[in-house]
Amino acid sequence: LDYIEDLGVNAIELMPITEFDGNYNWGYSPNHYFALDKAYGSPEQLKTFVDECHKRGIAVILDMVFNHATGLNPMNKLYPYGTDLANNPWFNVTPPHGDNVYEDWNHDFAPTKTMFTRALQYWLEEYKVDGYRMDLSHGLCGTTNNAMTHIADYYVNGVKSVAEDAYFILFAL
């Protein structure tokens, strides 16, 4: 970290660190949004890392994957594998944004928004991270930019309610 500080770096973005399937895919196959993945150390180690970054004036930004989940996600397991997604309100049968990766979250479903808002607040409060980079941000939306903006605003408001200066970066290719 001293070397990074000497370079003048003022922020570090970590790839997805929440629990994911296996030890491959760099965290982009998420299943639990409130748990640190086993491959990245202990909660205490992450807290120490964030504290050490902050001592050097370096912000810590987490890459969050809220557009899809794997079959190991508890909300996916509530419904038998292979059943019609139409019976599972947590996920879209067909992604409205055109990218089909794992199971696509239904961000129009109020409990989905509540769960993700709480996850964002959790990492800010428990680990003192400084903000988020949202992977495949158009995956948060319906079929229009207005829908994406509405849902992103919902999450931003949840973040700002606990950390007014937090970063919230939308990323889409």
Segments from the language model and where they lie:
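Glycoside hydrolase catalytic-domain groove-lining segments
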Residues: 55, 166-167
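Substrate-binding/active-site clefts of carbohydrate-active enzymes
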Residues: 1-161, 172
